[in-house]
Design a protein with these regions (language model features):
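Conserved ABC ATPase "signature" region
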Residues: 67-68, 115-133
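A short, proline-enriched helix->beta-strand linker immediately N-terminal to the Walker B motif
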Residues: 157-161
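Helix-to-loop junction immediately C-terminal to a conserved catalytic motif
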Residues: 52
Length: 247
C-alpha cells in the first residue's frame, strides 16, 4: 500500500503582486523519485523552501511526515529538518574544513554520536558515493564531481527520510553527470529515501524519475512518468520537452 509522505494542498504564493504559486496540488509517495520541471521563475525552488519552512505560502497547507509545515514554529521546523537532506547546486562545502569535517558537521550538530560512531558513519557514506579514503582531503583538492558526491554523502549522513536535489548535474561533464544520476537511483534503492529532484536537465529527469511534475504559470499542469509526459497532448509540456520554452 502506497503512503503519501508529502502533500501540497491548494498552495498560493506571490511576490510583489506576482503570483508564483496559483493553487499548487501535489502528493508525493514514500520512497519514490519525483522530479519538478518548469521554466525559470515557475516556482520550483520556492516550493522546496516552502516544504522545509524557509518560506510560508500565502495560503494552503503543506503536509510533511504527517505534520502541517505551515503551522510550525521555528523550533519545530528545525527538528523536522533533521529528517531531510539536501544536495545544493554547488555542493556548498565548507572550504576551510576537510571532507571528514564537512560530512561530520551535521552529525555533530543534530545527533548524539560518539566520535567512533561519527568516524564510522562518515566512512560508510563516503563508501556509498564511491569515495572511500578521502576523509583528509580539502575541498579545493576535489573535482566538481567529487565535490557533488561529498555533498551527497553529507546530505545522507544523518540518514534522512527525504532528500532534495537542486540542479544535481549542473556544470558537470556528461560522464560525471551520469555518475550522479546513477547515485540518485542507487541511494533511493538502497536506503528507500523519498527523493525530490529540481533540474533543467531532461536527461537527468528521464534517467532517475519514477514520476515528473511540471509547473507552469503557478500550477502543476502535468504529473506522470517520462513516457506519459512525452506522449502528453498538453501543449506546454510538449513545448518544454522540445525546447520551445526558455528554461
Amino acid at each position: 500500500m502506497t503512503k503519501i509522505i508529502i502533500e501540497f494542498k491548494d498552495v498560493y504564493k506571490s511576490f510583489n503582486g506576482i503570483l508564483v504559486h496559483n493553487g499548487i496540488n501535489l502528493s508525493i509517495i514514500e520512497g519514490e523519485i519525483i522530479s519538478l520541471l518548469g521554466g525559470s521563475g515557475s516556482g520550483k525552488s520556492v516550493l522546496l523552501k516552502e516544504l522545509i519552512g524557509l518560506m510560508k505560502p500565502d495560503k494552503g497547507d503543506i503536509i510533511l511526515l504527517d505534520t502541517n509545515v505551515t503551522q510550525m514554529n521555528e523550533e519545530a521546523l528545525i527538528a523536522l529538518r533533521e529528517h531531510i537532506g539536501m544536495l545544493f547546486q554547488g555542493a556548498a562545502l565548507f572550504d576551510s574544513l576537510t571532507v571528514f569535517e564537512n560530512i561530520a558537521y551535521p552529525l555533530r550538530e543534530h545527533l548524539k554520536l560518539t566520535e567512533k560512531e561519527i568516524q564510522d558513519r562518515v566512512a560508510d557514506k563516503l563508501h556509498l558515493v564511491g569515495l572511500s579514503g578521502i576523509e583528509k582531503k580539502m575541498p579545493d583538492e576535489l573535482s566538481g564531481g567529487m565535490k557533488k558526491r561529498v555533498g551527497l554523502a553529507r546530505a545522507i549522513a544523518t540518514e534522512p527520510e527525504i532528500i532534495l536535489y537542486y540542479e544535481p548535474t549542473t556544470g558537470l561533464d556528461p560522464m560525471t553527470a551520469q555518475r550522479i544520476n546513477d547515485l540518485i537511483i542507487e541511494l533511493q534503492r538502497k536506503l528507500g529515501i523519498t527523493t525530490i529532484v529540481v533540474t533543467h536537465d531532461l536527461h537527468c529527469v528521464k534517467t532517475v524519475s519514477d514520476r515528473i511534475a511540471m509547473l507552469h504559470e503557478g500550477k502543476i499542469v502535468a504529473v506522470g512518468t517520462w513516457e506519459e509526459l512525452i506522449t502528453s497532448n498538453i501543449q506546454v509540456v510538449q513545448d518544454f520537452i522540445s525546447g520551445n520554452i526558455c528554461v
